[in-house]
Structures are given as C-alpha cells and as structure tokens.
C-alpha cells in the first residue's frame, strides 16, 4: 500500500490549537479562506479536536457513500444535544431514539402530506403580504426578521395546528426565537473554545441553561395543550404523540417528543428563512433575473390566488432558489466519519472517529463542476436540463442520505410559495442600493442588515389585497379529479377480472397512488382486486392476472416494505417468472440525480430478466416538477389501459370502457336526529368569516340559505341543532375505550330522543345526541360516588355534592370531567348515557334582515374557547364551535323562533326614533334592524333618527362590521357611537371606555330623542344591562318596559 499524504492545514498552537486563526464572530468565513490556501482537504485543531474539511465535489461524492461513511455529531451540533438530546438532527449514528422517531415521522413528510399543508402555508404567506401592504412603501423592512416570523409561524401551524401569530404581536420576536438565537450562537461559540474556557464562562452557561429550559418548556406546553384539547387532525403533533414505530411497536417518550418538536421548530424555519432572505438579496442584485422571475409568475398565476398546482409550473423560480442555496447554503456543512479506515481522494487516510466536514459554501462553488463563473449568480445553470447533467452529489444543501433533511419537501414548497407570492404582489427595492452582503453566523447563516421597501403592484391598495386574498377559494386537493364514466352498466362488474397491486411506500405516497389506480381499475371491470406491500409478493406473484407495481427509491434503497422483495429478486434463486404479466410505475425526485428512479428501474429489469412479461413501458413521476396523480392518470390512459385491453380484454372485442358508476342506485335521507326535533328546516352555508383579529376573543359571521320562506323578522332568533366539538367526543370515546366506529344499539330506552333499535356509531352518539358538557347534577355525584372502590375518591365526590354550587355548577364541571379526574370510577356506558340530557338546540339572534336578502339568514357569534373554570383543559361552547367548524356548502338544521313582540322595529319607522345599545356580538339583532331600515329607505320612505351605541376593544381588534356600518351611516340609516375599552382615546371613541360612558357623553342627544318618543333597545350581558340601566335612569328617570326593551344573554 502506498504511503498516505498528510492532511495539510495551519499549524496548531499548544492548548488553543488553531483558535487564533478563527474570527469567532465569523468562524465560517475564516475557514472558507483556509480552503483557498490549503486545497480540497485540510484540517484544523479546535478544542483539542481535529476537524477535517472537504471542499471539492470529487471528495464530497466519496463522503456521501453511505456504505463507507455515516453522520458524525460533533462541534456545535454536539453542543446542541444539551437542547435537542437525541432528536432527528442531533442524534448520534445508530441511536435508538432516532430510529424510532425517523420511522414514525417519515410518512408525515411524504409528498401528499406536504401538499395537504399548502393551504396553511398560504395562510401565513398572506399574513406576510398583508403586513407589508399595510405598512406602506415608506417602511423599511428587515427581511430576515420577517421571514423568520413567517417560517416559524408556518412550521407551527402546518405541523402542530398551533398559531404563534408573530405578525400580530409586538416588534419583538417570539420568546422561542429569542432563546433559539442565543442557543445557536452560544453552541457555535462553545464548540470553538477550549473546554477550560467554557468552564469559566459561568454567566454564559447559566444563560444557556435558562434559554434551553425556556425552549423545552414551550415545547412541553404545546404537548400539554394538545393533550388537554385533543384535535382529530392528521398533523405532525398527533403523529409525535400517537404514532407507533412499525419495527418495535413503541411510541415516543415525552422527552423524545419535546426534542423533536424543538428540532422541527428550529430546523423547520431557521434555514428556510435564510434561503428566502438570500434569494431576495440576489434578485435585487440582478434586475434582469428579477424581471424574468416576475414574468414567469405573471404568466403562470396571473393576479389570482396561487395554488399548489402552480408551483410545478415555475421552473425559473425553482432554479433561482437552487442557485441561491448553492451560493449561500444556509446550513453550511454536514459531517461524516468512516465506518472503517478509508482512503479519501486516493491519498488521505481517514480513520473511524475522525470527522470530515463537507464545507458546502466552497464545495458548491467548485469550478471543476460549475465552471469559471461558479461564484456568480446564474440561475440558468440550475434549470432542469442543466441541473440533471451535474455530476453526482454536486448540490447537497439538505445533507445526505438517511440523515439528510427530513423536511426538505416542506421547506421547498413553502419557499416556492413565498417567493411567488411576494413577486406577484410587490415591487421590492433595497433600502440601501450600496448594501454589500454581510453574513450573520450561528450554526446557520443569513444576511445581516439587509433591508427592503415593498410597493404594491397593479395599483392595488392594502384593503383591495386583503379582500382579494380572503375571497380566494380553498385550493383543491391533489388527485381529486373524477374519472369519466363510460356507458357500461355497473352490473357488469359482477364476475369482473382479477388484478393485483403491490406498492413500496415509506411515506404513504406510493400506497396512495396504488389505491387510486386500484379504484380506477375497478371502474374498468377489474373488480377482483388484491392490494398489498411488495414484500408480500415474495414467491407470490400471480400468473393468471396483471400485476401492477408502484414504488420509489428511498435514499438509494428500497422502501422498508419492499426490501425483502428486492433481495428476493437479486438472490439468484427466483423461480422462473414466466407467465407473470406486470407493469411498474416509479416515483422519484430529480434532485437525487444519482438514485433517480433506481429501485423502480431495478425491479422492472430484474423481473423481466426472470421471465416476466412487461405489459408496457415503465411509468415515471417526478415529484419535483409535476403532480404525481396527474402523471399516474396519463400513464394509465396512454400506456397501461391499452396494454390491458390488448392482453386481458379479448372477450370484449376490444371494447374496454369504464363502468358507469353513476348508475348506482342510492338514496339520501336526513339524519335520524333531525326527525326528533320539531320544525327544523335545512340550511346551506354560503359564507363564513372571522370578524376579529388574533389575540382577542374570536367572533365570526356565518351566512346560510334556507330552503323555504319563513315569517322571520328583524330581531328574531333561530334555533341551531349542533354537534359536540370533536375533541370532546374523542375524550368520551377514550374514557370508555371505544373506537369512533364502534356500533351501539339501544334495545330499550325510556329516552324518546335517542334512536330506538337503530345501530349508531359511538362517535355519532356522543357527537350528535348527548350533552357531554352539561354540568353534573347532585344525583350524578351520588351515583359516581357509589361506583368507585376508592374511599378517598368517594369522600371527594361527596364533598363536591355538599358544595355543589361553588365546585360543580359554577365551574361547569361535567360528568365526563369527573370521570377523567376520578379514574377509579367504573361506570358502565349505559349508566353514563342515562346521566346525560339529550343534545339541545342553541338559540342565536338573526344578524341579517329577511328584507335585505330573501331566503338567507346570518348569525354573528362569539366562539367560546377558553380555559375551563374547573382548571382542567379548555371549555368549548357546543353551539359556537359547531358553527365555527362549518364551511361554505355545509348543511345545518335550523328552526325559526320569534323574539318577544316588543323586541322588533316600530311599525312606523318614519316617525319613531330608536336607540340601540350593545357590545360585542350583541350587535347581531341591531345589524338586522339597520339592514331593514336600509330597505325601508330604498323604498323612498323617510326614516326617523336611529343611534347605535356599540362597545368593543378597539378599531383594529373587534370593531365588527365597521365598513358596512360606515356605509349605512353615509346613507343616513343610522348614526354609530363607539366605545373602545382597550384604546378609549382613539377617535371616534372620544375617551369613552364602555358603552355607558358613551351614553353619558351623549346625554343631550339621548334626552332629545327620548322626548320625541324614542324606543331604547339593549342586547348584551347582564353586566352590561345593569350598567346601562343605571346610566339611563340617571339621565331619563324611570324606564318603562314599553320603551326600554332588553334581550339579555
């Protein structure tokens, strides 16, 4: 064996090594400069540890071979283990917790799951655009800070259904971000200092511990919040909490869950915000590129809403982002170590335990790969026709192999959307045209001090932008198109042909594609179907029917459920596959050029060599540039179906049409529970919107169309038949160990409002028939006490009984709450059901006048979602949360309910003045009053004076229907007097904090209207009514019921 070369590098000093060769504020830049001096491989000594750096594509290609090298956790990343322990990013190679978490979480980051997150990503992108639009073109924007807010809010919302609302808070960053920035910087610094120096930095160590504790506490609070308030959503947080490792059957411990939440919150936003910041820096430095990018967005999207389907049609945006990440990889290195002694580059010996850092800022500018202009920003080099020709492992900003970034697809989709949204909406300019790029370093990099100004395009105003985005419909989900039905009768499906589908799928994508293909094949007459993982096909490939394989490559290897199948094919002992007819559809991602479609190609070739008959050419879908379902449909129509027609449909003389599924005979009837209530009619939701800003109690507006005319008048009510919140239903199911689809049948019951002798699912029973949140009664407490074997629990329940009003009724403690608290209670489900009242209708005031929009109603309501008075979790209002869950097209059941006769408008609105007083959602009936007055005015009739006194928190918070009321004021329909409790001095609040203060300020006007026979109306809480009445009696004397009419809720 020839002698190995010594690895060059600056000469280290005793104890401190090469510490003095590094600028500790810009250590990365110091190391990059060394690459120019010492070549493609060099080493330095820091903290008594040798660090080897590789800077050429040729060396990186070797280091990415996972049969020779694996990830090493050292330096700053190792210091982060104090924070993230054995999370996905900081776990050592082979660490057990990493394996469990990785296998559980992989499906959560599959392409289809990522596409499902698009709507939430779009929500946060809109918030960014609204902020910039409302700030105006004169505002200086710290682009890195705003992108940090965006990416943190996005990862929290998309993966944990958790809103941080960074754009609605103060100018300071979220506490998690503040702690994160400190920890990242300190970990980087500690990795550069000798341990003796770190030991004497006591204050820094204490601060580090404090920030770590704060971050883990925030993650713990997220877990507690979800457990206290379960949500039936298919998000990452539920996967973390409830997922099970398919290999060991284990779930994740709370410590491991916290570590991975922190990992996602950091890794899921810090590098992406840097990518976006550098991308816009380069765009503003290159006006021609900026113009071409904007033109692409305008041509593909126009001025309409951006959809997930648009992203695959923006290749130049994709190339710009890749080029930006090439020049400025925001995670600037990853580290590997050999599994056994390895010779690198043919001349350097690397031993196990020695770590080699892939120095991406230099590797990705390798002139041997990218040419003499490798340091220049030239996006065309990253267009697909050029990118696909790059040597293997030339572009590795997301790391390598199984330890590469699990959230890469998430980050890329988010960044594409944001770049497209900003280009579509704004013209950007750098605040300082002479700005020279400075890089801020922690363990990641981003521009330092780069600021821009944003001007809305197309002459839009901020208000117009808001209306445009709010009116945009929800994006369609992938693969949702219907297949055209032919004219073959569905009865022909009986005795249909057989077909087998096998899939290899880690993330669930190929499994979903196989299911979709099976579904469409059902309509083509292949009704005898078998669908299973590829491993089940070992020694089990059928020969009397077509076999369709849908699979992908996972980090160069087969998926977990296809490993045995591929090993079988490669073993050399496969029996002849003569008689097997098959076709392969492969999925891949072009950025993994070395392994693109590797496994689908290998399976296709090995089966063919073993004697199987290839039905048609292999289908392929590139997840980077296309919609997988669309590619599958094209391959099905143009390749697979003709092949199946030729080989398996001879009996039909070539006629191979889809079954007409529309000839299925079905009937639809109203839910059983609707028939148990009188006078309910069907309504269809046509609009729903939030009326308040984040940070204040939520109020919503829902509008629905009814199927028949009613005698409703302004001021009347409607009864709504609700369902219980899903999280409350899940609690009940869990307490009685029931699945949602368990069937319950009442063989006999004294309750006439429960379905008799009719099977009903457990979820429907708890959701639609029972008052799960009803406070427990005294008798309930006695019954529960009699069923517990615990003397301690029995005494506690009896204590509750003796102090019923204060401990149960006033705190709204339900039977379900008690069952969750006293786990010793063994209550039969039948007894539980008998304890609960039947779910009742909820009553709301109309907020739309029938004359204003015939056959339509609207409600204005507060969404009750607040900490439970019992101190256990949150209390969810049944009716309001049901209404808040509706979307346009939803069906609800309502019945009209007249208000008391006095709570209506005067018969003669021309001569009788009115004064309306309310706060918050108490505005509802008065909105219908005002709309009816508008209809009266439009008929050419004169109107008597009307005053509306309205109390809320503030003009940008919960000033309900502000613009609409302003229009009515301009028309002379009403005069509005507001009181702002949070900003009383804001015009036009005139210093009045509450409604009664505003009434007092208008004493003269009110007395004059009272003298002209005005009627006073009030709608609100008992507290409001008490304060208002006292104020009015001080100025008007005794109030008669005929002229002072109240509705208290």
Swiss-Prot record:
Region of interest (Disordered), ranges: 462-492
Residue ranges constituting the FAD-binding FR-type domain according to the UniProt record: 678-906
Residues where FMN binds: 505-509, 584-616
Domain Flavodoxin-like positions: 499-640
Catalytic reactions on record: 2 oxidized [cytochrome P450] + NADPH = 2 reduced [cytochrome P450] + NADP(+) + H(+); an organic molecule + reduced [NADPH--hemoprotein reductase] + O2 = an alcohol + oxidized [NADPH--hemoprotein reductase] + H2O + H(+); dodecanoate + reduced [NADPH--hemoprotein reductase] + O2 = 5-hydroxydodecanoate + oxidized [NADPH--hemoprotein reductase] + H2O + H(+); tetradecanoate + reduced [NADPH--hemoprotein reductase] + O2 = 7-hydroxytetradecanoate + oxidized [NADPH--hemoprotein reductase] + H2O + H(+)
SUPFAM superfamilies with a match to the protein in the record: Cytochrome P450 (SSF48264), Ferredoxin reductase-like, C-terminal NADP-linked domain (SSF52343), Flavoproteins (SSF52218), Riboflavin synthase domain-like (SSF63380)
Documented EC number(s): 1.14.14.1, 1.6.2.4
Composition skew (Low complexity), residue ranges: 471-486
Cofactor(s) annotated in UniProt: FAD; FMN; heme
Described function: Self-sufficient cytochrome P450 monooxygenase that catalyzes the regioselective in-chain hydroxylation of alkanes, fatty alcohols, and fatty acids at the omega-7 position. Performs hydroxylation of C10-C16 n-alkanes and C12 and C14 fatty alcohols; and thereby enables the one step biocatalytic synthesis of rare alcohols such as 5-dodecanol and 7-tetradecanol. Converts 1-dodecanol into 1,5-dodecanediol as major product with very little sub-terminally hydroxylated products with the 1,4-dodecanediol and 1,6-dodecanediol more abundant.
Name of protein: Self-sufficient cytochrome P450 monooxygenase CYP505E4
Source organism of this protein record: Penicillium freii
Gene from which this protein is expressed: CYP505E4
């Amino acid at each position: 064996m020839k002698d190995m070369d010594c690895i060059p590098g600056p000469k280290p000093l005793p104890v401190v090594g090469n510490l003095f060769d590094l600028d500790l504020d810009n250590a990365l830049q110091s190391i990059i400069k060394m690459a120019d001096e010492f070549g493609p491989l060099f080493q330095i000594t820091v903290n008594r540890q040798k660090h080897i750096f590789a800077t050429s594509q040729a060396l990186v290609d070797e280091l990415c071979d996972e049969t020779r090298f694996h990830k090493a956790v050292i330096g700053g990343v190792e210091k982060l283990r104090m924070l993230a322990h054995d999370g996905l990013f900081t776990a050592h190679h082979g660490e057990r917790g990493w394996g469990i978490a990785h296998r559980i979480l992989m499906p959560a980051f599959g392409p289809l799951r990522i596409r499902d997150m698009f709507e939430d990503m779009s929500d946060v992108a809109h918030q960014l655009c609204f902020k910039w639009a409302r700030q105006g073109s004169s505002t200086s924007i710290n682009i890195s800070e705003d992108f940090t807010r965006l990416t943190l809010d996005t990862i929290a919302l998309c993966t944990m259904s958790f809103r941080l609302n960074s754009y609605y808070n103060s100018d300071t960053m979220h506490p998690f971000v503040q702690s994160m920035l400190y920890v990242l910087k300190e970990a980087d610094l500690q990795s550069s200092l000798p341990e003796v120096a770190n030991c004497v930095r006591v204050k820094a160590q204490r601060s580090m511990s404090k920030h770590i504790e704060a971050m883990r506490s925030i993650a713990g609070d997220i877990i507690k919040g979800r457990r206290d308030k379960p949500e039936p959503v298919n998000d990452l947080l539920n996967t973390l909490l409830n997922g099970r490792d398919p290999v060991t059957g284990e779930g994740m411990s709370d410590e491991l869950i916290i570590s991975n939440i922190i990992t996602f919150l950091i890794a899921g936003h810090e590098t992406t915000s840097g990518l976006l910041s550098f991308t816009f820096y380069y765009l503003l430095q290159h006006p021609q590129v900026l113009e071409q990018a904007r033109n692409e967005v305008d041509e593909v999207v126009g001025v309409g809403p951006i959809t997930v389907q648009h992203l695959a049609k923006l290749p130049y945006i994709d190339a710009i982002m890749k080029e930006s990440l090439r020049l400025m990889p925001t995670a600037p290195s990853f580290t590997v170590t050999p599994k056994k002694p390895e010779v690198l580059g043919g001349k350097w010996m690397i031993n196990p335990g020695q770590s080699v850092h892939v120095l991406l800022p230099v590797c990705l500018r390798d002139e041997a790969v990218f040419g003499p202009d490798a340091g220049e920003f030239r996006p065309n080099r990253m267009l697909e026709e050029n990118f696909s020709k790059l040597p293997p492992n030339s572009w590795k900003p997301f790391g390598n192999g199984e330890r590469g970034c699990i959230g890469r697809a998430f980050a890329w989709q988010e960044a594409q959307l944001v770049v497209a949204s900003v280009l579509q909406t704004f013209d950007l300019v750098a605040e300082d045209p002479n700005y020279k790029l400075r890089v801020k370093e922690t363990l990641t990099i981003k521009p330092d001090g780069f600021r821009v100004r944003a001007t809305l395009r197309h002459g839009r105003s901020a208000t117009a932008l808001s209306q445009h985005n709010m009116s945009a419909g929800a994006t369609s989900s992938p693969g949702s198109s219907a297949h055209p039905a032919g004219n073959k009768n569905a009865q022909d499906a009986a005795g249909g042909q057989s077909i087998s589908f096998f899939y290899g799928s880690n993330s669930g994508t190929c499994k979903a594609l196989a299911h979709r293909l099976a579904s469409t094949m059902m309509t083509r007459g292949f009704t005898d179907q078998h669908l299973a993982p590829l491993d089940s096909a070992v020694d089990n490939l059928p020969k009397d029917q077509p076999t369709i394989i849908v699979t992908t490559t996972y980090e160069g290897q087969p998926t977990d459920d296809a490993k045995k199948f591929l090993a079988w094919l490669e073993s050399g002992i496969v029996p002849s596959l003569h008689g097997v007819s098959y076709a392969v559809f492969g999925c891949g991602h072009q950025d993994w050029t070395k392994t693109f479609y590797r496994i689908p190609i290998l399976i296709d070739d090995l089966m063919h060599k073993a004697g199987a008959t290839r039905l048609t050419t292999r289908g392929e879908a590139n997840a980077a540039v296309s919609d997988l379902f669309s590619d599958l449909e094209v391959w099905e129509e143009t390749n697979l179906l003709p092949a199946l027609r030729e080989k398996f449909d001879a009996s039909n003389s070539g006629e191979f049409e889809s079954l007409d599924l529309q000839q299925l005979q079905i009937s639809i009837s109203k839910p059983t529970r609707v028939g148990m209530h009188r006078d309910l009619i069907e309504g269809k939701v046509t609009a729903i919107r939030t009326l308040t800003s984040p940070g204040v109690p939520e109020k919503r507006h829902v509008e629905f169309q009814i199927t028949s005319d009613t005698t409703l008048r302004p001021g009347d009510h409607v009864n709504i038949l609700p369902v219980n919140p899903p999280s409350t239903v899940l609690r009940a199911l869990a307490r009685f160990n029931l699945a949602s689809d368990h069937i319950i049948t009442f063989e006999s019951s004294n309750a006439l409002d429960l379905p008799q002798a009719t099977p009903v699912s457990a979820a429907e029973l708890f959701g639609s028939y029972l008052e799960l949140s009803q406070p427990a009664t005294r008798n309930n407490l006695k019954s529960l006490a009699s069923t517990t074997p615990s003397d301690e629990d029995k005494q506690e329940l009896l204590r509750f009984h003796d102090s019923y009003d204060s401990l149960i009724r006033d705190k709204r403690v339900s039977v379900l709450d008690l069952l969750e608290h006293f786990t010793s209670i063994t209550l039969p489900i039948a007894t539980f059901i008998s304890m609960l009242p039947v779910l009742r209708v909820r009553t709301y005031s109309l907020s739309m006048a029938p004359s204003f929009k015939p056959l339509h109603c609207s409600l204005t309501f507060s969404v009750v979602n607040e900490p439970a008075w019992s101190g256990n979790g949150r209390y969810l209002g049944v009716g309001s949360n049901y209404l808040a869950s509706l979307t346009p097209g939803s069906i609800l059941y309502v019945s009209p309910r007249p208000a008391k006769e006095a709570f209506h408008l005067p018969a003669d609105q021309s001569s009788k003045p009115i004064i309306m007083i309310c706060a918050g959602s108490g505005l509802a009936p008065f909105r219908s009053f005002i709309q009816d007055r508008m209809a009266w005015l439009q008929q050419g009739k004169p109107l008597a004076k009307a005053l509306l006194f309205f109390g809320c928190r503030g003009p940008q918070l919960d000033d309900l229907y502000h613009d609409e009321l302003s229009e009515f004021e301009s028309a002379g329909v009403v005069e509005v007097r507001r009181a702002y409790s949070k900003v009383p001095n804001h015009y036009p609040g005139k210093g009045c904090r509450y409604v009664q203060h505003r009434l007092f300020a208008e004493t003269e006007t009110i007395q004059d209207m009272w003298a002209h026979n005005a009627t006073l109306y009030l709608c609100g809480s008992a507290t409001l009514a008490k304060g208002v009445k006292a104020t009015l009696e001080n100025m008007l004397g005794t109030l008669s019921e005929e002229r002072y009419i109240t509705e208290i809720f």
